[in-house]
Amino acid sequence: MTIIEGQLVANEMKIGIVVSRFNELITSKLLSGAVDGLLRHGVSEEDIDIVWVPGAFEIPYMARKMALYKDYDAIICLGVVIKGSTDHYDYVCNEVTKGIGHLNSQSDIPHIFGVLTTDNIEQAIERAGTKAGNKGYDCALSAIEMVNLDKKLRER
């Protein structure tokens, strides 16, 4: 039996981050967490590109373009969608989730899902660096692990 696990060493990785400007109070904290996680595990600042998009709905489009135009090892997708009183929340959450999922099934690099979908702003704040940790940081670790898993599979 062979067990393959990814490591959290990120020397010489090139990482793209696409982040939503909508709910920037929270997405900026997710971004800080992601960058912190990447730097702490060996990614250099010059190997991190950050692209801001207007809202969460635009994340899959830009993530696809980033994968097409640059030689990234992974792309981290960060955003926040907070439930309101209309169905708009459901539509945005569904389409962003499907879009990033589609990229993962069609692309040769991992696209990490870091879009918070919460019932209220308090839940979003909790997941952006307070009670529930920082999901941006968690996404950075997921990106590193997935890139390393991919390398190990290719080497077999």
Curated annotation (Swiss-Prot):
Supply one GO CC term from the record. cytosol
Q: Give the GO terms filed under biological process for this record.
A: riboflavin biosynthetic process
GO molecular function: any one?
6,7-dimethyl-8-ribityllumazine synthase activity
This entry's Enzyme Commission designation comes to: 2.5.1.78
Pathway membership of this protein?
Answer: Cofactor biosynthesis; riboflavin biosynthesis; riboflavin from 2-hydroxy-3-oxobutyl phosphate and 5-amino-6-(D-ribitylamino)uracil: step 1/2
Name the residues that bind 5-amino-6-(D-ribitylamino)uracil: F22, A56, F57, E58, V80, V81, I82, F113
Q: Where is the active site?
A: H88
| Residues bound to (2S)-2-hydroxy-3-oxobutyl phosphate | S85, T86, R127
Q: Which UniProt keywords apply?
A: Riboflavin biosynthesis, Transferase
Which reaction does this enzyme catalyse, per its entry? (2S)-2-hydroxy-3-oxobutyl phosphate + 5-amino-6-(D-ribitylamino)uracil = 6,7-dimethyl-8-(1-D-ribityl)lumazine + phosphate + 2 H2O + H(+)
Query: InterPro entries from the entry?
Result: LS, LS/RS, LS/RS_sf
Question: Transmembrane stretches, by residue range?
Answer: none
Q: What class of enzyme is it?
A: transferase
In terms of Pfam families, this protein maps to:
DMRL_synthase
Q: Which family does it belong to?
A: Belongs to the DMRL synthase family.
Mind telling me which NCBIfam families this protein's record contains? Answer: lumazine-synth, PRK00061.1-4
Summary of the function given for this chain in its UniProt record: Catalyzes the formation of 6,7-dimethyl-8-ribityllumazine by condensation of 5-amino-6-(D-ribitylamino)uracil with 3,4-dihydroxy-2-butanone 4-phosphate. This is the penultimate step in the biosynthesis of riboflavin.
What is the protein name given in its UniProt record? 6,7-dimethyl-8-ribityllumazine synthase
